[in-house]
Amino acid sequence: MASYAIDVDSAATVAAGLKFAQERNVRLSIKNTGHDYIGRSNGRGSLALWMHNLNDMSFFNYSSPGYTGPAAKAGAGIQFFDIYREAANHGVRVLGGYCPSVGMVGGYVQSGGHGPLAASYGMAADNTLEFEAVTVDGRHLIASPTQNPDLYWALSDEGAGTYAVVLSTTIKAHVDDSTAGAFFSLLNTNPDKY
């Protein structure tokens, strides 16, 4: 577990945390929910940037050279159960994972973002329109295909916490429609036969 933590509330807080960690040569970790099966967000002995309280979200019409249509902006603390509910209230859906308590912005999107709707809409990284981030040198910026495009592409699928600390993500929203799913389970009552 982290030895120290900063409850992040702004870009300035992140920049101060980054500066502190650099000046004192302290390992830095970034954590929202901690859903990481290899524990990268825990960082033993690190200074943790706890992103969980960046939980603003909004739905709006987005316009850029590459996409015009409905979109959702989610703070780094948003979990899927939060955004799924709010998206339904706006008549749209956003891509997400199966587990509703996973955070949307960190490792999910920045590691590609596979989920139940990927066959219909692509991976979450393919639906990401922009990232609001703080770079290691403390710059607060937007990364999109037209603004800071190298950082945008790096954040889109190279893993969370690798290139910048992401404060929010803007992702395409799709018109809500009916979906179907199935669950298949086999029960083996004989432990000698698998």
PLM features per residue range, with description:
Residues 1-194:
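Soluble FAD-dependent oxygen oxidases
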